[in-house]
Amino acid sequence: MLMTKEVLSEFAELIRENKCNPYSGNLKTGVDLGTANIVIAVTDEDNHPVAGATAVSKVVKDGIVVDFVGAMQTVRRLKAQLEELLGVTLETAATAVPPGIIDGNVRCISNVVEGAGFEVINVIDEPTAAASVLEITDGAVVDVGGGTTGISILKDGKVIFTADEPTGGTHMTLVLAGYYGIPIEEAEKLKKDKDKENDVFPIIKPVVEKMASIVKRFLSGYEVDCVYVVGGASCFNEFEQTFEKALGITTVKTNDALLVTPLGIAWNAGADCA
C-alpha cells in the first residue's frame, strides 16, 4: 500500500503541475468518464505514471452518457492537451464502466472515447480497475463516484461479484443544497471546499452511512475482511471511519482516491508505440 500511495501522489502532482515524466518504450492510456470528472491517465509499459489530465464534467449521470457531444469534446480536448505535452499521438485507450450497466450504455461510453480519436482496446468495470492499482487479491473495492457506487468482491485475485448502486457525491450535494437552501452549483462548491469540511461532513454523514448499509447488503454471504474505498466522493477525512463503523468491516482509503480508478484503467490498456 505504501508504494501505491507514492504512485498516486506522483500521478496527482503530474496532473496538478501539467507536466510529464520522462519515459522510454510504449505508452498506455486510460479514459475514465465519471459523473463529476473526466480523467485521462497515461503510463509507461511498467505502469509508472507519465502524465494525466482532468476536467470537471456533467456529461455522465449514473453511468449513462447524457451529453454525447459534450463528453466527446471534453475527452478530445484532454487528449490533445496530453499529446502536446508528450509530443506523441495517443492512439489506443482502455475505458471503464460501472458494474452491471446494460450493453447499450457500455457501447455508448466506448463510442465517446472512439469519437474523441482513440481506438478502444479494453473496457473494464471501475472497481476492478481500482483493485489492480491497490494490488488487492482478496477483499472488496467500493468505488464512490459522483453518481454511482460500484462494488467488486475479489477472491484469490479473481472478481467473484460486482454491483452498482445509484448513489454518490451528487446525493451529498443535494443534501447540502436542501439543508442550506442554496442552488446545486453552490452546494457542489461547498462540498469540495476543504476549509468547510468540518461543517459539511456532519450534514452529509447520513449519506455515507446509507452507502455503507447498501454495501453491507451486497457483502452478506461473502467472506470479506477488508473494504477498500476509492472515488472522488470519498475524499473526506472522516469518510472511512464513518463507513467502517456503519459497515462493521475494516475500511481502508488511500490518498488521492479520485485517481485510483483512472490509473487502473491505464494499467489495463495495451501500449501505443511512442
Task: Describe each PLM feature range.
Residues 1-35, 39-144, 158-274:
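Nucleotide/phosphate-binding catalytic cleft detector across ATP-hydrolyzing
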Residues 150-152:
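A structural feature that tracks compact, well-ordered secondary-structure segments
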Residues 147:
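Short glycine-rich anion-binding loops that position phosphate/pyrophosphate groups of nucleotides
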Residues 155:
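A cytosolic small-molecule/anion-sensing beta-strand core signal
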